[in-house]
Every structure is written in C-alpha cells, then in structure tokens.
C-alpha cells in the first residue's frame, strides 16, 4: 500500500522554495488513464505550491530533461513513480529482460539524483498503476492541504 506516503510528501513539499520546480518521473506504461492521473497530480502540485511541474516518462526523459535534472542548479524536486506488473519480454542473447533493464534504469536515475544531493522520492504504485495513482491523488490532496 501507500502507507507513509503522505508524511513523506509533506516533508518533501516543505523544502520547496520560489524558483524551484517539481519533476514527475513516471517509470510506468504510458496510457491514457495513467497520463490523465499524472496530469491531475501535476495540476494539484503546481496549484498548491505555485511552482512549475514537469512530467516525463522513463526512460525517454533521460535523453532530454534528465540531463537538466542532474546538471545545473539544485532547484528540482523529483517524484519518481514505479510499479510492478509490467509486461515483460526477454532480451535475446541476454540473461535479463526488458523489465529488469527498466528497473535498473529507474534505480540508477534515483541513485544519481540522490548522490547529487537532489531532493527525490520514489512511490511504488504496486501491480495496478492506475489504481495506485487514484489512491495517490487522494493522499496528495491531503498532503497539500496541510
């Protein structure tokens, strides 16, 4: 479940100052339901905190905004979403799958952000990302209201 997430969000959001931005880093299968729920998160965060909020899907964002996240100023606050239950395919000639590769990439991205002293948190949405995001939006609304 998402127990403990509200407290973590409140702690993370208390660090945000004018000039900062929030980056939603979604390591999820991109579909209409997931995108719509993430856009809702984006609107809630931006509206409540008065800072820009970006949304990127991994691993694609690593080749564009991912460079900005790691270089330059430390104005970014990063909220990484992961989930279990991804469709998986073996990579021919290798002893790992695409899900393994995806997981390693998201782990590495979070580790680098942390190593650079960036403010970052991960939320694992469980086996059903859309349902997890529905629960998360409710938790987010509560965290932003306090």
Where are each of the predicted segments found?
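Phosphate-moiety recognition in structured ligand-binding domains
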Residues: 1-146
């Amino acid at each position: 479940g998402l127990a403990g997430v509200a407290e973590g969000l409140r702690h993370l959001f208390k660090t945000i100052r004018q000039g900062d931005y929030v980056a939603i880093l979604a390591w999820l299968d991109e579909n209409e339901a997931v995108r719509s729920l993430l856009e809702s998160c984006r609107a809630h965060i931006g509206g409540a905190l008065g800072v820009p909020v970006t949304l990127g899907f991994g691993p694609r964002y690593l080749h564009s905004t991912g460079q900005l996240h790691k270089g330059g100023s430390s104005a970014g606050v990063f909220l990484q979403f992961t989930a279990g239950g991804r469709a998986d395919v073996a990579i021919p000639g290798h002893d790992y799958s695409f899900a393994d590769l995806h997981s390693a990439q998201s782990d590495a991205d979070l580790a680098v952000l942390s190593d650079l002293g960036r403010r970052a948190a991960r939320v694992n949405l469980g086996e059903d990302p859309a349902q997890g995001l529905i629960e998360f939006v409710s938790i987010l609304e509560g965290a932003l209201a306090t």
